[in-house]
């Protein structure tokens, strides 16, 4: 809808933010962004479009580090999975990537940061421990959430911070993040710190129309559940690897 408003009001180019989670999506947020990319491939036949996929923006509202800030201010234990790895970018880096894609991206290109798996991919538990040491506290690993809560006041008084790290069993969490798939055509030579996915206008117009009709039918019905939305996603993205466990990382964090 925003693309059509831009086009109909004389815009020369359209830019849109995607996410690293759109590459081989395993959760609904990543899948919805991948679907957005698919719709924009069709719209790119009428006006140039570029996009950016980037990682978690450090300290942005709702991010892991924002949550750590809130827990630290409230003197609460830290809880995080020890087997999920994530990339992080600063607000400035994310803004620069968006500007580069908007100004320099060719039609249908998706820009992403060149981040090293060995240098920049880090587990949530490692981030928590580095954060606490930066704040002047030594992380103290507890065996359970209950122990972390019960010993919080005692440990914090001794400049130790209670932490509970666990193996992830939550819905829609990848073990690690990726910015592209092995099926996408990449340009890794144009910029030092940025790569580009070069897309062709390949799409199934009938499937896109069916998805739009399905969403509209749910809206007209006035009620829906998660499974109804998932069914629409699976019809358009048969490779969508969503696994529902009934548990969510936000609840554990």
Where on the chain are the PLM-derived regions?
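Conserved Rossmann-fold NAD(P)-dependent oxidoreductase catalytic core, especially the SDR/UDP-sugar
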Residues: 1-34, 42
């Amino acid at each position: 809808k925003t693309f059509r408003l831009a086009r109909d009001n004389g815009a020369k180019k359209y830019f849109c933010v995607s996410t690293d989670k759109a590459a081989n999506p395993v959760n609904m947020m990543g899948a919805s962004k991948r679907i957005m990319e698919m719709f924009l491939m069709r719209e790119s036949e009428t006006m140039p479009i570029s996009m950016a996929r980037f990682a978690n923006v450090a300290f942005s509202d709702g991010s892991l580090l924002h949550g750590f800030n809130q827990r630290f201010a409230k003197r609460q234990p830290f809880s995080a999975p020890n087997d999920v790895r994530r990339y992080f970018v600063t607000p400035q880096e994310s803004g620069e990537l968006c500007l580069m894609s908007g100004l320099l991206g060719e039609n249908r290109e998706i820009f992403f940061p060149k981040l090293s798996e060995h240098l920049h991919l880090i587990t949530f538990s490692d981030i928590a421990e580095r954060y606490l040491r930066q704040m002047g506290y030594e992380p103290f690993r507890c065996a359970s959430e209950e122990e972390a809560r019960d010993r919080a006041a005692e440990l914090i008084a001794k400049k130790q911070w209670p932490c509970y790290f666990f193996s992830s069993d939550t819905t829609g969490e990848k073990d690690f993040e990726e910015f592209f798939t092995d099926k996408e055509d990449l340009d890794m030579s144009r910029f030092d710190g940025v790569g580009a996915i070069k897309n062709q206008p390949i799409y199934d117009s009938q499937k896109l129309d069916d998805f739009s009709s399905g969403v509209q039918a749910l809206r007209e019905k006035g009620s829906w559940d998660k499974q109804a939305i998932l069914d629409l996603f699976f019809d358009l993205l048969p490779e969508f690897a969503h696994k529902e466990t009934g548990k969510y990382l936000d609840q554990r964090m």
